[in-house]
Every structure is written in structure tokens, then in C-alpha cells.
Amino acid sequence: MTFETISVTLEEGKTLVFETGKIARQANGAVLARMQETWVFSSVCAATLEEPVDFLPLRVDYQEKFSSIGKTLGGFIKREGRPTEREILTSRLIDRSMRPSLPNRLMQDVQILSYVWSYDGVTLPDPIAICGVSAALAISDIPQINIVAGVRVGFINNTWVVNPTKAEMDVSRMELVLAGTEKAILMIEGHCDFFTEEQVIEAIEFGHKHIVTICKAIEDWQKQIGKEKNTSAVVPLPEQVQTAVNTLVEGKFSDLLQIKEKKAFEAASKQLENDIVEKLQEENEIFTPLNIKTAFKQAKSDYMRSLIRKQGLRSDGRSVTTIRPISIDTSFLPRTHGSCLFTRGETQTVAVCTLGSEAMAQRYEDLNGEGLAKFYLQYFFPPFSVGEVGRIGSPGRREIGHGKLAEKALSHALPDPAKFPYTIRIESNITESNGSSSMASVCGGCLALMDAGVPIKTPIAGIAMGLILDDDHVTILSDISGLEDHLGDMDFKVAGNAEGITAFQMDIKVEGITPEIMQAALAQAKSGRQNILETMKATLASPKTDLSQYAPRIETMQIKPNKIATVIGPGGKQIRQIIEEAGVQIDINDSGLVSISASSPQAIEKAKSIIEGLVGEVEVGKIYEGRVTSIVPFGAFVEILPGKEGLCHISEFSKQRIENVGDFVKQGDILPVKLLSINEKGQYKLSHKATLSE
């Protein structure tokens, strides 16, 4: 293969370049995509499946090499291994962008690998990776329905910006990553600062305009150098199988859908499927169990769609806008800082809020350096939540993605860290699942925050919207169930308060949807969100005014940066002494902000007093509660601040004459003294009798 390259300019200074033919020439497709000095290499490979499967076996792995910034990993192991959270989230973005563009019943195992080989700290790599993967897929022989591209959109200084720089994203009020084709949107993921539905659509349309430009460039490149597609890898379902299955299920789905409980419905549905497989699999070689099951799934989807289109009724009997019954139980757990049992239909979470000091913050390291997350939400999806047996271990990609979406949704409602200096951890423990568990995590997490006494700006709720798209007939569903997610065309999650949006995520199974459909879905989502918020407010209208008795107390104080070393002491000796003496936890940042946490206000005050003593400057004329450190014939030395002591002469103890200082005070006594003066040598002159008249 010869070396080939194309370029596409999005805005001035933002030119995306694709190269192929020099690297990884044995892959089905391989592209080096670059913008400025951020270079991302992507490859796609396919292998024929040994056994046909009823799903698309697509695997995506994105990795950020630390060598791309001239560094190696810290610690003993220097080789990149377990993916970071950011790498997992980007892998999901690529997967969700590419999956709708691959044909159903593609009988190939497809693997996508994407590596950041060079990162300039300016141009963010994930949209480049999406485009690079799409270009590699386009020029490969792997079948593809449509060419895809992806961009990031930011909102900086009231202006939409495509593929903003790292510095621009740090001040952007929105982060939106979207992917699509020339004609439609396939995937969106983002969060924003209470934007309206109109603003979100405006951002999507702005981003899609640039997606069209990239798609056209990749399409032209494909026509010039692309391999012939291996269409034999796509095995359509024989019409004879679908017809036979449709005949056998006729009239039976109406009885099946009378079963409202999820597990009972699934059992009955599985039994019906098995009966049909048993009846048909001996017909001839095309009636394989896989083909029959695929046809059964299609027949079930067709019936559900027909029911919605003709009667406006869903599989569980709801109308298209009806939300499942909600029940809420706050302060559900007695010893946690805040908790909520949130149930919506057959989806349920036990959400828990835990407050702590900076020591509880989540530390991370990526190409942009080390960071500290003082708010994070962790989502747990144990197998019992769907009545199954499964592994327990490190979180899967789905758990990471759902947790991050809920975290972003709630993050915009958090109080100013300067006024509420706590690290906040929310865990969402999914105990039942029948659709929309990530949005249940938003609702339950918000109520747990309020139950913990976190002064959030506004309550946040989330809802998942679905879509049934048949020819020109569009039906939008509110609060979709697991079945509607499985058989429908869209899963569009939207979170926010009553007026604005804070987070959103959309995945589709069709070839794309238009901004007009998304606009209708967002409008219906707003109505549903407001309905859920009213239910939440009926249980807990506002955050509790007091923290839990089991939550630590945290206060902050500001010291001069040049005094940080004084508080820490040689080898940390001084700060360890304060922690031990006062019974507190202390964190100090580079600006001199000191965070003190303890179980009691008294312990915090003691620590503050010690620190103030260490960093405080003595003032002439000020009275101090000093400690007698030693007694001499002519007076006593008194420590007025840690490390700062002066002489209280025998004549300064009393208005009456005294003969022996030892008769008046003992070493270790607390003695009020007034600082009279500081001589040229920096020595302090103290007086006790000067305090007697004050």
C-alpha cells in the first residue's frame, strides 16, 4: 500500500490530517490522525467468527501513552496496563460512535485499537481518535453502513467553539462530544451549566456542521484508496425464517404483555422462544437456533412498535409520556452521612453520600498531569439487581460510564468549595434494574446529598427517553424500561433541574436521528424531569440544615504561603504534632488554604489556635495567654506564641513588690501577659501587671 494523506480544515489553525500506508500495513485499516502536535494512531481488524452470534462482537481499546508527553508512569511498574477512567470513557465514546455504522448480522469479530502517540497539551485527543477510527474503518474491507466523524463543542465567551483547546475547555460552560454521519446524529455525550433545550440543540447543530465536513473528506478518501468491502461477511436473516416465526407468534404477544413483572415476563418470553425453536429447527438448514431467535426478537419488536403506533400503549400498559411509580425513603441507613432508597418502577438504587476531608479525595493521573477530584460518584451494578449470577470485581466499562454521567449531572449543583470545603463521595448501589438505572442514580444521589445536608444550588433529576421510528412515524417514550431500551431505537438520557440541563447522553440503533427529533425528545424530557422533581420535593424539599452527627466537621483558614513550611515543620514533625495533640486531620494546599477536619468543633478550634500561634505575628500592645517556660531570679520567660518567648521582669508581675517569682508562678503555668516592646535585638518585653487593669 502506498503512503496516502488527506487534510480537512475545521477552523483557522484546526486542520485534521489523516495518513495511511506507512504504519501497520497488515491491518484491515490503519490511520494516523493528527491535529497540531497531537497524534493518534488507530487500527481496525476483523476475523471470521467460528460460531455465529446474535450480537455485534466489537471491541474497542483506547490508550494514552505517557511517552506521548515525554514521561513514564510513576511507581514500580512502568508499562501501561489497566486502563484509566479517562481511557475507558473514551473507548466507550468510540464504540458508541462506530457501532451504529456497522451492519446487523456482521459475522466478524471486529477489534479497534487507538493509541495517543503524541500529545501537545493543547489539542484534546478523543475527537481525533473518533475520526481516525472512522477513517481506518472507511478505507478497510470491513462492511460499513455510513461514514462517521466526531467533534467536541465548547461554549467559551458566549461563542460555540469546535474542538476547543485544553485551556478553552477549562473555562467552557459546556462540554459536548458528538458523532454522526453527513445526514444525522449517532451519539452525543455532554454536560453543561443549566443550558436550555434550545441551547443544547444549537450546540449539536453547530457540531454537526463540522461533522459533515469531515465525513465528506473521509468519503472522498475512501473512494480514492479504500479497499473493496467484504460484503459476504454480512449474512442477512432469511425471509422464510422471519415469516415462519411471525406465523407461530401471531396472537401470543398480546397474552405475553399482560405479564407486568419483569422476571415473570422474561421467563414466559424465553419459554415461548424455546417452543418456537423446538418446532422450527428441524425444518431445514436455514432454521438454525440463532436465526430463529433473531426472528423472534424482531417479531417481538415489531409487535411492541405496532402497539405503540396504533394504540399509544406501551408493553407495560403506560402511555408514551407516563413515568413509572416512584417511591422515596431518605435517611434510609442510620449511620451514613446521607442516604436514600429511590425506586422507580422495577429500577431501584440505594444511594449513599459520604463527607470527608481532602484526604478522601480521588487522586488520578493522566496526560494532563495529576489531579484531585473532591466530588465523585461511583456506580455499582451487582448481578443480583437483574436476578443473575455473575462476577464481582473491578468495575466494568458500563459501570464507569454510568457513574461518570450521573456525576457530571450532579456536579453543576454543588456548592462553592470555599463555603463547603468537604470532599463528597456518592455511591449508587443498584439493587433492582429494569431500565434507566443511571438516571435513578442521579435522582437518588441528589436526595442523598440533600439528606446529608450538602447545600446544593438546586435539586437535580434524570430521565431516559426512548424512540420508536417506523418510516415517517416518530414516537418518543418517557422513562423507558429495559425492554423498550432493548427493542427500541434510542436511549436518550437527560438530567437537570426544572429549567435547565446539566448532563445528557444519547445512543441509537438506527442510522441516525435529526435535530428535530432530538428537540422533541428534549421537550418531552423536560416535562418528565419536572414531574420527577415534584415527587422528590414532596419527600425532601430542600437540603437539611444540619450535617449528620456522624459526619466530620471541617473548617478552613488561610495562612501566608511562606508560612506553610512553619506549620509542616522539618519532615512533617510539626503538623504531625498538631494532628496528634488536637485530634484532627489537616490538609494544606500550595496557596496556604488550611483545611481542618475533626469529629468535634472543639478539636478544630484547638488546632486553629495552635496554627495561628505558629504563623501569627506578635503585636506590641496585644495581650497573650502565655505559658511560663522557665523561672529565673529576675523574672520568668513566657512563650506567647509557639517558638516566640520573652521576659516578664520581676517588677512586671504585680503592682506590689514581690521577692520571689517562684512564689507567684510555676513553670508550665498559663500567664496573661502584654507585649510592651520589642528591642533592636528582637527581644520581647512582657508585663503581667499591665493586664490587671484591662
From Swiss-Prot:
Q: What class of enzyme is it?
A: transferase
Q: Which residues form the signal peptide?
A: none
The biological processes this protein is annotated with in GO are:
mRNA catabolic process; RNA processing
Segments forming domain KH: 552-611
Function text: Involved in mRNA degradation. Catalyzes the phosphorolysis of single-stranded polyribonucleotides processively in the 3'- to 5'-direction.
PANTHER family for the chain = POLYRIBONUCLEOTIDE NUCLEOTIDYLTRANSFERASE, POLYRIBONUCLEOTIDE NUCLEOTIDYLTRANSFERASE 1, MITOCHONDRIAL
The name on file for this protein is Polyribonucleotide nucleotidyltransferase
Q: Which gene encodes it?
A: pnp
